[in-house]
Amino acid sequence: MRAKNTEKIVPNYEELSLDTLLFKFNFVSLQSKFMRSVKIKEVIDALEKFAPLPLQESYDNAGLQVGLTGAEVSGALLCLDVTENVLNEAIKLGCNLIVAHHPLIFNKLSQISDKDYIQRIVIKAIKNDIVIVAMHTNIDAAAGGVNFKIAEKIDLQNVRFLGKTQSVQTKNGEVIGGLGVIGELTKPLAADDFVLLLKQTFNVECVQANQLLRRPIKQVALCGGAGAFLLKTAINEGADAFITGEMHYHDFFGYEQQIQICSIGHYQSEQFTTEVFKSIIENQCKGVVCHITKINTNPIIYI
């Protein structure tokens, strides 16, 4: 059998004709032409298609916060909160779009000055042509949104909405949203093992909890952020445990051996929201480079 010649053949471009070289150049140019640029508005449209603004709570201010959306996206920085450090990070990375979970502008602004960090961010974002958009309670309520991501992290099965659902009509058709989710663990856990699972999954040193449940935990309800309003619904739906980000002192009273309450921290409960943003943008807006912020914006420290 004749041995194969494995020597790498290097083309001699000096021997290529001018027509061949021009063809190669035009082919590359044609490829670049069809790699369509994406406008900021298209990214926002993709996010709002997934989580329409009508799903947000009446008190909320989700949606566009700052800027003009007609420019091409140079990069998207994804975060929970927009702080001055996050804005500086976007500038350093060359991102002209910041997608945040919590709205920068929540209350009415009566002036734009350097009085506080919100106003300073607005001014600096405009100066640097950076658009800021927030996806808040609309993506909390969306199917596949924040609460579904939390459920995924602790491997809940048969996940469905916990509280009331609503249907909104959009140009893309009907979208269903709801409050919180409920699902089942793959196997029952003792209460102390369940708390350990939360500590490991959400990288928290402590969990605020009521008296540990003496029966196994199988069915789990949850709501990211401040979800105490869904506690009684969780009990009515037969949940063994309820996870949320924060609760008031008096919310813990009266449920001993009825349900395991676990408050893991507002920031900690919503920390994976940026993964939801990234998935939407990369699937719907091909070519847009997404960066998840490296800045921990949690204003609460544990000493």
Segments from the language model and where they lie:
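Intrinsically disordered, low-complexity terminal tails and inter-domain linkers enriched
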Residues: 9, 27, 167-171
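Short, positively charged and aromatic/hydrophobic N-terminal segments
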Residues: 11, 20, 24-31
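Polybasic, lysine-rich low-complexity intrinsically disordered segments
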Residues: 4-12
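Active-site catalytic microenvironments in core metabolic enzymes, especially phosphate/sugar-handling
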Residues: 34-303
